[in-house]
Amino acid sequence: MQFIDQAIIDVKAGSGGDGISAFRREKYVPAGGPAGGDGGQGGNVVLEADDNLQTLLDFKFQKLISAENGQRGGPNKCTGASGKDTVLKVPCGTEVRHLSTNIILGDLTNKGQQLIVAFGGKGGFGNARYLSNSNRAPEKFTEGKVGEEWSLQLELKLLAEVGIIGLPNAGKSTLISVLSSARPKIADYPFTTLIPNLGVVRRPSGDGTVFADIPGLISGASKGIGLGHDFLRHIERTKVLLHLIDSASTDPINDFKTINEELTSYGHGLISRPRIFVLNKKELLNENEIKKLLNKIEKMTMKKVHIISAVTKFGLDDLLSSIWNELGY
C-alpha cells in the first residue's frame, strides 16, 4: 500500500432545510392557524480515528466531501428530517488544520475519537413560529442556513514511543526487523527505506511498544533536502529517540553531529527529547577501534553509549533494558 501522510481535502456540511408557510385546513376548524413546520438540520462532516488505517491514501483523489442537506418543513408543524452526517475514517495520529489559517482544529490520536470539521446549517423556521397576539395568521417563514465549507490539511504523525534515527545506511531497518516482526526493505545502499516503518517490540511484561524507523535524515533534511523533512514529523510524538551511528562509516563523529544539527534545526523540542546513543555494526571494527570511537562519543554526549551489532544481535538485550528503563516500564 502506498504511504501518504499528507492530504488536502474540501469538506462541505449540509445546508438546513427551509421552513414553510402553511395553515390548518381541517373542515371543522374554521379559524385554522399557521401550521408550517421547521426545516431539518444539515448534516455534519465528521472525522473519526481508526487504528486499522496507516495512511491517508484514501484522500489523495477524494477532494470534495459533503454531508446531506436537511429536508424542508412540512404541514401540521412537521419538522423536516435532518441530513445524515458524513463520517470519514482517518488513521490514529492525524492532525487537522484549516488550510487558510493554519489553525489546528484537532489531533485524532485515540481509536474512535471524533472531530466535527464542518457543522451543518440550521433549519429555517416555519410560519407557525411567528404566531403572536398581534398576528394570528403569519405567512413569514425562513430559509435554512448554509452548511460550513472549508479546505483542510490532514497530516499524519505516526504514534510510536521510540523513534530510530540516524543517517542512511546506519542499520535502522535491520535493527527494527531484528527487534520486532517488522520486515522493512533492507539493502546495503543509502535510502533503502523510503517510508517510515513501524514495528512492535515486546516488553518483558508481554505488552508491545511501537518503534518507528525514520528514513532519509541527511545534512539539510530540516530545510527540505532529501527525504528527512517529510518524515521528521513522525518522531514529534515519540517519548525516546534511539540515535543510531554507523561505527564503520567514513566519519562517525561527523555523522553524529549531523543528526544533532538536524534535530536542532527542525525544532519541536526534538533536540531535548530523551535520547539513547547507539554505535552499530560492531562486527566491522576491531576492539581497539570501537573503544576509541566509544570514548569520543561518550565525551561528546556525557552519557553512556551502547555498542551493538544488529546483524549478530550483540548488545541488544542491554539496549532494550535501557529503553524500557527510559520509558518507565
Swiss-Prot record:
Subcellular location: Cytoplasm
PROSITE patterns in alphabetical order: G_OBG, OBG
Residue ranges of every copy of the Obg domain listed in the record: 1-159
Gene Ontology CC annotation, any one: cytoplasm
SUPFAM superfamilies for the chain: Obg GTP-binding protein N-terminal domain, P-loop containing nucleoside triphosphate hydrolases
A Pfam family: GTP1_OBG
Residue spans crossing the bilayer: none
Keyword entries, A-Z: ATP-binding, Cytoplasm, GTP-binding, Hydrolase, Magnesium, Metal-binding, Nucleotide-binding
MF GO annotations: ATP binding; GTP binding; GTPase activity; magnesium ion binding
GO biological process entries: ribosome biogenesis
Annotated ATP binding sites: 166-173, 191-195, 213-216, 280-283, 309-311
Broad EC category: hydrolase
Function: An essential GTPase which binds GTP, GDP and possibly (p)ppGpp with moderate affinity, with high nucleotide exchange rates and a fairly low GTP hydrolysis rate. Plays a role in control of the cell cycle, stress response, ribosome biogenesis and in those bacteria that undergo differentiation, in morphogenesis control.
Family affiliation: Belongs to the TRAFAC class OBG-HflX-like GTPase superfamily. OBG GTPase family.
Oligomeric and partner information: Monomer.
Protein name per Swiss-Prot or TrEMBL: GTPase Obg
